[in-house]
């Protein structure tokens, strides 16, 4: 509408946006949902699947999982069914070990989710991962450093906290720092909290 100022348009867009922002990683869209359950209306974006590898695995075990990933790729009712992401967890503090596993995962051609709490390991992993990545590792304790790493690399940032209240506070701080490209982990420490 030509009569609205840019500020008014921005405010209107923010107020009418879906409660869950759409995040794009590679060719895939996450979020953008306006309902919690499919029977309420419909889910906007399909569920995406990942295979998990970890620095705690032997190299042979990780290589086998990544090789088997390529076997799950078929078409059903006109829709391609395959594993879209590789989830790469870091359980060590050695950036070189993590970067090597990330390099193997990136070679599959799938988008990556990098679970990493250490800033130096995250930097090493992002150097070999490419752009289609979710850096999953911001917490109330390290969100400033992880936000800087994610913004520099131009990737989505995953945010964790022990409680919903802490998660809310951390997200508010990240948004105030200019990052709205976030994926939130609302999983609690126990099933009851989730």
Predicted features along the sequence, with ranges:
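Glycine-rich, proline-tolerant flexible connector loops at the mouths of alpha/beta enzymes
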Residues: 2-8, 53-61, 80-103, 110
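N-terminal amphipathic alpha-helix/helix-capping segment at the start of soluble metabolic enzymes
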Residues: 3-67
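Short amphipathic beta-strand starts and helix->beta connectors
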Residues: 33-37, 97, 170
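Acidic (Asp/Glu)-rich catalytic clusters
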Residues: 41-44, 66-81, 102-107, 126-130, ...
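Hydrophobic faces of well-ordered beta-strands that scaffold small-molecule active sites
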Residues: 47-55, 81-90, 110-115, 133-137, ...
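Well-ordered, non-membrane alpha-helical segments in soluble/globular domains
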Residues: 59-73, 95-101, 166-169, 193-194
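N-terminal active-site wall of soluble small-molecule enzyme domains
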Residues: 90-130, 142-146
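Catalytic alpha/beta core domains of metabolic enzymes, predominantly
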Residues: 141-194
């Amino acid at each position: 509408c030509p009569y609205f100022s840019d500020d008014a348009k921005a405010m209107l867009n923010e107020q009418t946006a879906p409660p869950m922002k759409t995040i794009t990683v590679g060719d895939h869209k996450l979020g953008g949902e306006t309902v919690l359950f499919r029977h309420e209306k419909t889910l906007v974006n399909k569920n995406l699947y990942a295979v998990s590898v970890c620095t705690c695995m032997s190299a042979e075990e990780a290589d086998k999982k990544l090789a088997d990933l390529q076997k799950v790729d078929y078409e059903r009712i006109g829709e391609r069914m395959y594993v879209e992401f590789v989830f790469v967890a870091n359980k060590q503090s050695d950036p070189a070990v993590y970067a090597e596993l990330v390099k193997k995962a990136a070679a599959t051609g799938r988008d990556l989710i990098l679970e990493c709490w250490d800033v130096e390991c995250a930097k090493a992993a992002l150097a070999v991962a490419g752009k289609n990545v979710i850096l999953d590792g911001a917490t109330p304790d390290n969100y400033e450093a992880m936000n800087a790493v994610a913004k520099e690399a131009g990737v989505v940032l995953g945010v964790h906290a022990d409680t919903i209240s802490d998660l809310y506070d951390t997200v508010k701080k990240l948004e105030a720092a200019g990052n709205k490209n976030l994926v939130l982990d609302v999983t609690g420490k126990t099933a009851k909290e989730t």
